[in-house]
């Protein structure tokens, strides 16, 4: 029995560890360090219909416990992704999750309709929560009605299950999650980065050319855990949790909160071997905690409370 096997809509994962979109490119660089077949899946970099060159530099700033980024969805565009990147990934026995982005609803629909036809794309991740672009992105993820409408429109054209990436930069994430579920989403991924800023001590000006950027890394893990904990209790669709994961212990904590799988982001920049290391360490941690299968951890924090009432 594979103790780490996870079954999600459109995704049969040998383990629940997935490199997060934007922190793994299309896998080429990391394939130099290890066999990507050990992963559960890969969330490829956000894809837009036309190539995007991203925001001006500087686009990255270190922070205590993480980093700020304002990349701005730089990517080679749908044609290049489907003509080069996805075919390259076919050599691996991995279900690919394609991250879809755009400036308006029609952009998402156009990309989703085409990229969902790729033979190795098993699910879509709608990026409605990027805080680093002036149009689209987070604008779709902070309003329940708009988020639901976009989800519904994409579901109508997609040939694979649709997961929606939630923004933490909202007052009530539960309301948005429910609206997206009711619109037909097959799953949720959460959370995206928190909007932040750093100032230069000598100039008093923002370090990032974009002024603000998305905060990621261990600093946001408590926020991510809290939000997964809240949302998982009110939706009936699976959650892929993310935000500051860098160890097997972090993975279990997200499962306790209610996640069914996890995505590892910023930690890949610090240690390119972090994903295979976590996968290797998970079975012994399950032994230590007395679990036979990773699924036994799912929602344990709140399910125990419900059972004791």
UniProtKB/Swiss-Prot annotation:
Binds 1 FMN per subunit. PROSITE patterns: DHODEHASE_1, DHODEHASE_2. The keyword Cell cycle does not apply. One of its GO terms (biological process) is 'de novo' pyrimidine nucleobase biosynthetic process. GO terms for cellular component: cytoplasm. InterPro entries: Aldolase_TIM, DHO_dehydrogenase, DHOD_1B, Dihydroorotate_DH_1, Dihydroorotate_DH_1_2, Dihydroorotate_DH_cat, Dihydroorotate_DH_CS, Dihydroorotate_DH_I. Heterotetramer of 2 PyrK and 2 PyrD type B subunits. This is Dihydroorotate dehydrogenase B (NAD(+)), catalytic subunit. It comes from Bacillus cytotoxicus (strain DSM 22905 / CIP 110041 / 391-98 / NVH 391-98). The lineage of its organism: Bacteria, Bacillati, Bacillota, Bacilli, Bacillales. The gene is pyrD.
